[in-house]
Amino acid sequence: MAKPRVYELAKVLNVDSKTVLEKLKDMGEFVKSASSTIEPPVARRLKAEFAKDNAKGDSKPVQQRRPAAPSAPASTSSSAPTPAAPARQASPASAHQQAPTPGAPTPRPQGGARPGMPTPGRHGQNDNRENGRDNREGRENGRQSRPNDRRNNDRRNNQGRPNNGQPVQHQNNRGNASAPRPHAQGGAGANGGNAASNAIPRPHAQGPRPGNNPFSRKQGMHTPTPGDIPRPHPMARPTADNGRGGRPGRPGQGQGQGRGFRGGRPGQGGQGGPRPGQWGHNRPGQGGGSQGAGQGGARGGFRGGQGGGNNFQGGGAPSNGPARGGGRGGRGGAAGAFGRQGGKSSKARKNRLAKRHEYEELKAPTIGGVRIPNGNGQTIRLRQGASLADLAEKINVNQAALVTVLFHLGQMATATQSLDEETFQILGEEIGWNIQLVSAEEEDKELLQQFDINLDEEELQDDEDLKPRPPVVTVMGHVDHGKTRLLDTIRKTNVIAREAGGITQRIGAYQVTVNLEGEPRKITFLDTPGHEAFTAMRARGAELTDVAILVVAADDGVMPQTVEAINHAQAAKVPIVVAVNKIDVPGANPEKVRGQLTEFGLVPEEYGGDTMFVDISAKQNLHVDKLLEAVLLTADAELDLRANPDMDARGATVEARLDKGRGAVATVLVQQGTLHVGDAIVAGTSYGRVRAMLDENGQPMEAAGPSTPVQVLGLTSVPTAGDLFLVASDDRAARQIAEKRQATERAAQLAKRRKVVSLEDFKKKFAESEIDMLNIVIKGDSSGSVEALEDSLMKIEVSDEVGIQVIHRGVGAITQNDVNLATVDKAVIIGFNVRPNRQVADLAEREGVEIKYYSVIYRAIEDIEASLKGMLKPEYEEVVTSHSEIREIFRSSKFGNIAGVMVQDGEVKRGTKCRILRNGVATVNDLEISSLRRFKDDVQSVKEGYEAGINLGTFNDIELGDIIETFEMREVERK
């Protein structure tokens, strides 16, 4: 059913739209304008409220405003009764000739509405009946004057009713010109539906839809008209007597001619109007036509009169009886047609769902004119970066309602905008829900479970499926303590020669074979950077490793990055083997290193602890085999290194880069299962199919088991170092997982960017807007290097006046898009081990974009720090340059007073700032030496010990003995 609009209801209720809007506001409903739609339950409540108001307004007696019609005693004879009041003839001509007299009823117009009555519309036929008059005294008089047993009188009088077709004179007790329904005469029959006018109106419910009535000419819903203007229905017209009676109500009682009118409502006086549609047929609830004179009132109570006809009882009271209060007409049955037969027309039956919905609406709190179901403290879980649309779907409410509630809480957001956790908590407290945002790990698990991937169940493996795997060893320590040299010695390679600046700037993964007691054992090594900028890399390496080798130089001892490496290993609960390196260097003191590490919980075995210390020299290859043996012994003693090689591969991304010829290349470490060429994999937000696998020496591989580092080719994009990878069932599933992760990550970033600015923080935010920002675009050869460089640059703190903002970072060569982005945002491009092609370099030169190239990370940090210092606003300090004593004053009509001075110290220059000191007190500041002469010559400066003439422009207040002090403002370097 279509939702009605406010102006439509105003037309139905015969009031203006403003009155309806005020009534809705009093009812607690939020409606914006007259063209707004409202729900059907609200419309029914509104009609009921107006009905109550009309009942209260019409409850005063109306007999004081009009004379009551005289009544005549009822006649029990079978002849036509004498009317109780002067009656008019039923012919149309007599209706126009007679004039109303005091004390007599006003004649009613034929075939249409009475004067002053509103034009009936489709929506207003049932509702206009509620404008009837109420007169309790008249109703009591009617009750006293009627017989005690009406049914017996009906049965006796029906046998003797005349059937000669003569018009029946009837009385109209309605003195008011306006009436709720139009009335007309029904041919030659009598108006048997006339009722008393002094009854109490009752609000009635709208009947069933016309589509359920097989006897109605209008089926289905109301067809809208232009402007939704109600069209009048045809009224009853005088018709000839066709000899048909009304619809039978009870068999065995008299024959009626003509058509009766519908009985009045309970407590409502007056004649009932005809029903549009079936002319000449009466339905249950309509007064049946009867032959003979007299007024037939409708039956009282809630049951309407019954149709009259051949030997059937009419719907009105006996012809010789007094008028009674009209009853509510009942809806007729369809006799086997649609739905239940018969039934009362009070209200359509509500199913349980509708009743429950209304009950919940009553319980729901009203916030800002909308109703939200109260959660009563129930917990609901949302993902990171969720929006109001997600919350509305969870709690089954309208999105616009949540937007309205949030607006009334002082925050503005759209339905699809990502919100932070604080905003959700405020909103949840208001509507009674405990909103919790799940962590990224739990959200990723729920995402994988949608694709039948359960990581928790896969970790629970049977012992029969587990097989031994090589240990993963991470080499950690301070920069330049010999980590890479140790790996070169083990692998018999020279990796350190290929590193820029002699320091490691990426994680290297290798696998070597070591003979332990004549048995070949494999060990996987991860070489982590030791520079302070690579903290994230070291932490990631500690999470992937089984055993950590802590390399400490015997000559330097414990350094800051050494302590950091210890903290990473202890946080990951990884056993540590200490390698005291450079024991061949003069000044080496291994015992000092042991004593320093004891303070951090690493107690050597010789001191009664459980940490193995090995003194080595990686450069001279001394005791390296003992170190490897200690690593294997520690792994065998403290760890259970087993994995299932038969399951789908799971692991972590160690490093990733963008190769010009091969695309995205990711170095991954397989932790569970076996990775094969052709598998569909997902690594973070990247996905693809394994086209090729290479080992650390560049040799192709077909399969990689647990604890095996390999380089994977075939990903669509460069993953982030540290992302977990897994094998999906097919390419489609891999793509869907990656795309959903991208959407989740993007929503989480948008939620972080959205910051709610309160009035307290407004000044702080305004001050931050005045900070000069250095925009930077970072491009590097690997994701780990880019991450380390970004973290290092963001840690630079020069002053509160300047800051750094990384607007873009990526892996690969510098492209045209990077230059365009830097042009718009006035940014500087930093290329870390990458270069642009010729066309991109020319474009950057034309656009004036600065590109800086670096291969060592600490040089990039130093240059950016210097650039930030150069962006600082200059600071100036006052520097006194000279003092000159006034010894003579020369007065000139053209130049004013001229001071003859002796320069005591410094150098006086023309155009410099000066002040006058009189008795050690500065009388005037911010003066300027406008002219400077040495005798008659204009000079630029005069040095100490010389005389000069100084003119101070328009300032003439000088005296002998005053001191002219010159000064200048010099810029001071910011630190």
From Swiss-Prot:
Region of interest: G3:
527-530
Task: Give me the stretches of Basic residues compositional bias.
Answer: 346-355
Q: Which UniProt keywords apply?
A: Cytoplasm, GTP-binding, Initiation factor, Nucleotide-binding, Protein biosynthesis
According to the UniProt entry, its GO molecular function terms are:
GTP binding; GTPase activity; translation initiation factor activity
Question: Locations of Polar residues compositional bias?
Answer: 167-176
InterPro entries of this UniProt entry? EF-G-like_DII, IF2_II, IF2_N, P-loop_NTPase, Small_GTP-bd, T_Tr_GTP-bd_dom, TF_IF2_bacterial-like, TIF_IF2
Stretches the record annotates as G4: 581-584
UniProt lists compositionally biased (Basic and acidic residues) regions at: 47-59, 124-157
List the PROSITE patterns hit by this protein, alphabetically.
Answer: G_TR_2 (PS51722)
Query: Annotated region G1: where?
Result: 477-484
- Kindly give the PANTHER family that the UniProt entry links to this protein: TR-TYPE G DOMAIN-CONTAINING PROTEIN, TRANSLATION INITIATION FACTOR IF-2-RELATED
Q: Which family does it belong to?
A: Belongs to the TRAFAC class translation factor GTPase superfamily. Classic translation factor GTPase family. IF-2 subfamily.
- HAMAP family assigned to the protein according to its UniProt record, in alphabetical order: IF_2_B
| Protein name (record) | Translation initiation factor IF-2
